[in-house]
């Protein structure tokens, strides 16, 4: 390690937080080789936590993430040249049989939240580097680190942002430093594994017992684990970390969950290893607010209990009272003693029976390999149940027999048409109800209650239908989308399969609807190009109808007229959906736009516009968001909900957008760009109609949305709704809807960053923005949600009276008296009351070409 005086290129500060507990040996070796003095933030303490508490954008994020704020503050106080905390989407894959090697959304992108919310970074001009880096790809990593440190950082310094010392960094130096860092990282992990093997050998030789304290790397922080390793050791156990033994065996696959997070792969492997040993048991550490652990805890529990092992989980957060933990550990000790007594009795009985010739010796288990150890050979001591989970495929015969395919509701306007597209293609698709409070109760019965609200609602919809008696379960299947990303949504399918088995229906096929290969095979369910095209038109039409309905309904001259017009055109669209093409889709849209554009309205544009963004299901599903659009309209406002299609375009655009930061396949990029161009071609005629209309606007293209997002964060933030959520808020502000409800499931991991964490920066860039984040889950108080929304709306109305954030280019009537033709600027507006002089001036200035007689 170089001291600051020995380092020709200055000092780099690294926070002792999150994935640095995994990656620090790599970064220490890398920067030391380049000639930097590496300064690690001080050890965590309550003081560390308190130092960062004012900058935390979300109180429901996990304790390890909260702690990182204090570590950055510690480095700011130490005046290092720059702070290094890269965003790492993928770890290096340790188990080639695992589905992927993601970091969780918080570990991946929380440095973004730190940069946007710690005021000292901006106020003191701190150089805080948090680039996305392809940590999993050695070649791409060399390219990216050279760009960040030798090109971008120098340019920033020349612009007055940061300070660069010493000689210019060359590409060959970066390459050599990366090679050295890979070697140091490999030695670090080999040392941990060797120490784990030696400790296990000691346990074996001395007749001891070990506890695998399984969690994530940052659970090794004594402040985060609250000295639990020492507590367990005080009871006479040897304590192992999950990564010290996970290399010794791999789980049999496929396991039930989609194994796509690298730290989790270790949990499943070490749980499997524990089931093969009499001298090991496992305690899992779970941080409060870690939604992914709702998946891992269930899976680890299944692996252990299937083999007769005891599962124990300890939830930890900032509260350090270990009384409950001591009780759980003592309970585990008592249970282990009981098990040991039973094993001894069984062994004694078996020995006596064998001596009498009444029983044959037990044959060695075929599931007892010698493990891949470097120093020792560890044999399985006990039989272990298979971890493989059988999948039931949806066959062509099932399709031909007309199986009912249950599809959970997400976006009622759009899915109403998508259902007809699939039915026209020969699938007996049954769309489940959109108003289904019983589904919430069913979900809570079958799903770990720490999982996110959409997971509960999706699983609950299906299980309520399964248990309703409405369907012939011998001819029923389920379809669910899988994104393949690092959000929990990819594991909806695992939750549904678990619920079906627990309800006694493991034979029901669960079909994966996904654009990526995730190990699912359903020969009876194929998405053809024709079906895909019609589905896109269905979503496009849903977006158009949603915009027009929400735009007109608050001002309809005749109550119910907007809904009646909506139902008329939706009925026509349902009949047309299985035959949708560019011609008939465009013709139907032309007629619908003309009808909505000319329907009689009263006081058009006199109500504040309130945008609705957020996690995709909560944003669109009325049950999930407690009918938020109805609430907005009931409070005298106009709802603006960005369309559904953009979510799919966002997903398709990521390969192109992340190529410089993370690298991506040229073939994938070309394919996705071709699809985006095709969709743009499909919707261009209708966009032109919307632009020519008096009341409506065409949505921005996805490339424009990405550029908006870049003003706040990296477009590599692409887990969940990712950068699109931020872009939608910016777009709403730009189009006269600065009042925004950010709907999100309680503890939605991506939304901690791309939702809650960006609000402060949006307010800084756009002082007129009026944003409220509202959490939704089964236990959330609807009264609390309503109070937060009503408070935001009261501010919206006050701002509208003052002319703040008011921008409606296409609304003439609001500013023109229909009788005299004089500018009224909201006088006697039913929503706002008399207008101020400031409002009159503001409206006159902003309306521009929108004023028509």
What are these regions (language model features)?
Residues 1-853:
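An N-terminal assembly and electron-transfer interface module characteristic of large anaerobic redox
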């Amino acid at each position: 390690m170089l001291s600051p005086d020995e380092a020709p290129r200055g000092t780099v500060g690294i926070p002792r937080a999150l994935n640095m507990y995994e990656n620090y040996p790599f970064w220490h070796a890398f920067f030391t080789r380049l000639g930097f003095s590496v300064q690690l933030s001080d050890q965590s303490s309550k003081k560390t936590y308190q130092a960062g508490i004012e900058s935390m954008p979300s109180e429901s994020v996990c304790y390890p993430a909260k702690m990182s704020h204090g570590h950055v503050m510690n480095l700011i106080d130490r005046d290092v040249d720059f702070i290094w905390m890269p965003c790492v989407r993928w770890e290096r894959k340790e188990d080639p049989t695992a589905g992927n090697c993601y970091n969780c959304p918080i570990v991946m992108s929380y440095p973004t939240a730190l940069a946007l919310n710690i005021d000292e970074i901006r106020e003191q001009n701190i150089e805080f580097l948090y680039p996305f880096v392809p940590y999993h790809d050695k070649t791409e990593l060399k390219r990216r680190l050279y760009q960040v440190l030798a090109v971008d950082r120098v340019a920033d310094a020349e612009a007055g942002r940061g300070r660069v010392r010493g000689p210019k960094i060359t590409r060959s130096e970066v390459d050599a430093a990366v090679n050295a860092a890979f070697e140091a990282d490999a030695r670090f992990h080999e040392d941990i594994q060797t120490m784990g093997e030696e400790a296990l050998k000691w346990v074996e030789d001395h007749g001891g017992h070990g506890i695998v304290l399984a969690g994530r790397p940052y659970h090794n922080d004594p402040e985060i684990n609250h000295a639990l390793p020492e507590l367990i050791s005080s009871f006479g156990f040897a304590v192992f970390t999950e990564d010290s033994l996970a290399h010794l065996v791999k789980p049999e696959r496929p396991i039930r969950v989609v194994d796509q997070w690298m730290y989790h792969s270790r949990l499943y492997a070490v749980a499997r290893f524990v089931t093969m040993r009499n001298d090991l048991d496992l305690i899992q550490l779970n941080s409060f607010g870690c939604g992914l652990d709702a998946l891992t805890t269930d899976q680890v529990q299944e692996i252990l209990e299937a083999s007769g092992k005891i599962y124990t989980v300890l939830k930890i957060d900032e509260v350090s009272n270990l009384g409950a933990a001591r009780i759980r550990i003592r309970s585990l000790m008592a249970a282990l003693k009981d098990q040991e007594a039973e094993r001894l009795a069984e062994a004694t009985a078996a020995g006596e029976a064998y001596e009498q010739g009444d029983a044959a010796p037990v044959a060695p288990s075929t599931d007892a390999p010698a493990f891949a150890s470097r120093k020792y050979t560890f044999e399985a001591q006990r039989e272990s149940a298979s971890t493989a989970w059988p999948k039931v495929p949806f066959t062509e015969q099932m399709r031909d027999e007309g199986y009912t395919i249950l599809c959970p509701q997400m976006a009622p306007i759009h899915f109403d048409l998508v259902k007809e597209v699939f039915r026209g293609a020969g699938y007996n698709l049954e769309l489940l109800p959109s108003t289904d409070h019983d589904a919430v109760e069913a979900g809570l019965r079958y799903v770990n209650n720490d999982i996110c609200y959409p997971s509960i609602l999706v699983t609950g919809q299906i299980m309520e239908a399964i248990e309703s008696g409405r369907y012939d379960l011998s001819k029923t299947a389920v379809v669910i989308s899988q994104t393949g990303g690092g959000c929990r949504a990819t594991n909806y399918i695992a939750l549904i399969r678990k619920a079906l088995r627990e309800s006694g229906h493991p034979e029901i096929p669960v079909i994966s609807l996904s654009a990526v290969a995730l190990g699912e095979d359903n020969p009876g369910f194929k998405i053809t190009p024709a079906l895909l095209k019609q589905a896109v038109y269905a979503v496009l039409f849903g977006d158009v109808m949603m915009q027009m309905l929400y735009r007109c309904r608050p001002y309809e001259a005749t109550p119910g007229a907007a809904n009646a017009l909506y139902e008329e055109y939706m009925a026509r669209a349902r009949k047309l959906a299985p035959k949708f093409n560019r011609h008939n889709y465009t013709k139907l849209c032309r007629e619908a736009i003309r009808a909505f554009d000319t329907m009689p309205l009263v006081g058009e544009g006199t109500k504040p516009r309130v945008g609705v963004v957020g996690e995709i299901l909560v944003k669109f599903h009325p049950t999930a968001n407690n009918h938020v659009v109805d609430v907005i309209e009931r409070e005298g406002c106009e709802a603006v909900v960005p369309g559904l299609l953009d979510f799919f375009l966002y997903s398709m655009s990521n390969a192109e957008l992340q190529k410089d930061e993370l690298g991506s396949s040229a073939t994938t990029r070309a394919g996705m760009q071709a699809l985006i161009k095709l969709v743009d071609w499909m919707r261009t005629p209708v966009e032109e109609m919307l632009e020519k209309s008096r009341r409506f606007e065409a949505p921005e293209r996805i490339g424009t949305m990405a550029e908006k997002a870049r003003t706040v964060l990296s477009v590599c933030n692409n887990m969940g709704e990712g950068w699109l959520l931020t872009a939608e808020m910016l777009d709403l502000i730009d189009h006269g809807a600065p009042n925004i409800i950010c709907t999100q499931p309680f503890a939605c991991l991506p939304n901690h960053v791309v939702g809650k964490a960006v609000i402060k920066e949006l307010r800084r860039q756009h002082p007129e923005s009026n944003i409220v984040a509202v959490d939704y889950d089964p236990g959330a108080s609807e009264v609390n949600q309503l109070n937060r929304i009503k408070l935001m709306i009261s501010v919206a109305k006050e701002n509208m009276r003052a002319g703040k954030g008011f921008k409606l280019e296409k609304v003439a009537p609001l500013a023109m008296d229909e009788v005299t033709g004089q500018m009224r600027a909201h006088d006697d507006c039913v929503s706002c009351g008399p207008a101020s002089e400031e409002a009159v001036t503001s409206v006159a200035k902003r309306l521009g070409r929108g004023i028509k007689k």
